[in-house]
Amino acid sequence: MNYHLMIDEKFTDDFIADAERNAPGNNIYLVSLYTPLPLRTKSPLIIYQRSVKKYWFSRIAPHLKSTDQVFIHWLDRRVFDIVLSLPRGMNVGIFSWMGDLIATPTCLFEKEILKPISYAFFKKKKRFRFQKDRSRGEIYNLLLFGRHLWRIVTAPLEWNKKKKVMQRINLFFHWNEFDYHWVKNHYPGFHARLVYFVYDVGLDSTLPVHPIVKDDREKLTIWLGNSATVTNNHFEALEELSHLREERIEIICPLSYGEHPDSVYTRQLIEKGKHIFGNKFIPLLTYLDRDQYYAMFQKVDLVLMNHIRSQAAGNVFAFLKVGKIIFMEEKSTLYQLLRSENIEQIYPMSELQHYSFSALQALTIKGHTNKNGTEIINKRLKERNLKKYLQ
């Protein structure tokens, strides 16, 4: 039997459908639920638990067999003890998003993945600081504050335990070998085998097939980042664009995912965007479903993804699929992968400030004859590996 330790996230149902197609009836799906009802998952095969750890040790651990396998879909401290309790000969795999390996414990890799202005903001406004949830009452926020303090105090212990967990994992399911090498370099003793797998990131959804044809008198529409998180390095990207402030541009900045719309980061980002660009800076604060979100791509001319850490792959592949030009941070493992595959639509962020308005206009109408980026996603290999490792 395959035991999947999962979270209530939007791609969980898609994975379950893939797993059941390749290994029907051979999987149990445990989802940690921190809200009264599931918000993003609907599969009837899911077993929801407030404490997956308690459920595991009372209901599953006594009946484990040596041939069983455990697969993690989001690695946090709630599953550490489960992994460390497993027999040595048992397969333990992680279907990696990378975010769980980079974002926790708090403040571990921020200096590496944030650019100077964003890191200065992080140190002053976010590191070790507690932000109230204004939609909840005082008692709830008091409990949150207690958890916040506990996470800070126990961060060194969490890191030591997490390294031991990573040493126990022997299968690393992921699609980007550059991410895999990042993990090997940052987690001592990690020697898991890389197995090709990619989550469904929605590229089969409705995407604009025929882009809007613009002439050189129309404004240039720029898409900035993918979420309201400091790892987008938004502040630096706005500085890189500032030489275009008087030009015919608009900047669409999606902020409905990540931090709350009234968070310090979101408010200061909007303030900076409006200060430099005025009404040309357009924050998206309302949640859109996937098809609505992708429908907006039709009007976009240019995309900026200033992340250093592995992030926004779904957005990047979707923009590539519809032929958009993307400027990316060169340290990004996704940038490194796309450049290694000779994807011509990708440009380094460091060159953006050297492009004039007219040069960017010309770039957006330039023809690209190579593969569009999504072709490097090997769905057949993904299906073969699911069948191989889950049956």
List where the protein language model places each region.
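A conserved mid-protein helix/loop that constitutes part of the nucleotide-sugar donor-binding site
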Residues: 14, 229-243
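Short N-terminal targeting/anchoring amphipathic segment
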Residues: 60-79, 91-95, 302-303
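Active-site proximal beta-strand in glycosyltransferases
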Residues: 69-70, 87-144
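A short, active-site helix/loop in glycosyltransferases that binds the activated sugar's phosphate group
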Residues: 130-194, 385-388
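Conserved donor-binding/catalytic core segment of Leloir-type glycosyltransferases
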Residues: 211-232, 251-253, 374-375
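Glycosyltransferase donor-sugar binding loop
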Residues: 251-267, 283
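Nucleotide-activated donor-binding/catalytic signature segment of Leloir-type glycosyltransferases, i.e.
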Residues: 266-287
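A charged, aromatic-enriched C-terminal amphipathic alpha-helix characteristic of glycosyltransferases
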Residues: 355-391
